[in-house]
A protein has these predicted regions:
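Glycine-rich phosphate/diphosphate-binding loop of Rossmann-like nucleotide-binding domains
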Residues: 1-65
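Short glycine/serine/threonine-rich phosphate/pyrophosphate-binding segments
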Residues: 2-6, 79-82, 101-103, 124-126
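Short coil/turn connectors at secondary-structure junctions
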Residues: 13-16, 66-68, 89-90, 111-113
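Alpha-helix-centered segments that form part of catalytic cores
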Residues: 50-68, 119, 186, 190, ...
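Rossmann-fold NAD(P) dinucleotide-binding segment
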Residues: 58-67, 76-93
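Short, well-ordered coil/turn residues at beta-beta hairpins
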Residues: 72-74, 96
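Adenosine-phosphate binding glycine-rich loop
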Residues: 91-222
Length: 223
């Protein structure tokens, strides 16, 4: 979970990953770690210690307290406790594991103004995609099979109109991207993003409209 979260945040969203915790310890680099390079290094050496241009910490949990924007505990439960919670310097905690923040730590972090994206919401992505897979199995037709060529033909007509209006031909690479119809992966990602966005908005709305609810975790449970 942690690998894929870091990989997509870096490669698709331009995030700078400064710290990674593994079983043998943790590595830190303020200039940023290339997630795939770290993954391949660990695969080859069996550890992250010694990864180039990084600082290694034998006690990996110590870097939980390092300043960052988003902290993603993604492996074990109970890693953020009442003991280390007061020392955390992040703005957001995204719970990608089950129960990584204890009850006492949760209270402390809320008082500190640190936003917690709860596991009950954040871990729903896998279940959502499993639901999509179930729908696909019921129909025995892969997503995009019925409309991909139609979408490509529509895109081609749009490009022809644009080129006609501009009086010049579009760059071939830009044209290829515009012409490409939706494939199964794109459609699944689109459906997942829509589901997660809508769900998060419902959680926020629940928190804002119910005066008894003061945090996202309680709002998620209330839904």
């Amino acid at each position: 979970v942690g690998y894929h979260a870091a990989k997509f945040l870096e490669e698709e969203d331009g995030a700078r990953i400064i710290g990674i915790i593994e079983r043998d310890g943790a590595i830190l680099s303020e200039s940023g770690l290339r997630v795939e390079e770290v993954f391949q290094y660990k695969k080859e050496h069996g550890k992250v210690e010694g990864f180039p241009e990084s600082t290694f910490f034998k006690e990996g949990a110590k870097i939980l307290e390092h300043p960052c924007d988003i902290l993603i505990p993604a492996a074990m439960e109970g890693v953020v406790t009442h003991e280390n919670a007061p020392r955390l310097q992040c703005k957001v905690i995204a719970e990608a594991a089950n129960g990584p923040v204890t009850y006492e730590a949760d209270q402390i972090l809320n008082e500190m103004g640190i936003l917690i994206i709860p596991d009950a919401y954040l871990n729903a992505g896998g279940v959502t995609v499993s639901y999509f897979e179930w729908l696909k199995n019921l129909s025995h037709v892969r997503f995009g099979r019925m409309d991909r060529r139609f979408a490509e033909a529509q895109n081609e007509r749009v490009i022809e109109l644009i080129e006609s209006a501009l009086g010049k031909t579009l760059d071939i690479q830009a044209k290829e991207k515009l012409l490409e119809g939706p494939n199964e992966l794109n459609l699944v990602r689109s459906g997942l993003e829509d589901t997660m966005r809508q769900s998060y908005n419902e959680v926020k709305q629940q928190e804002h409209e119910n005066e008894k609810i003061t945090d996202r975790r309680t709002a998620a449970y209330a839904l």
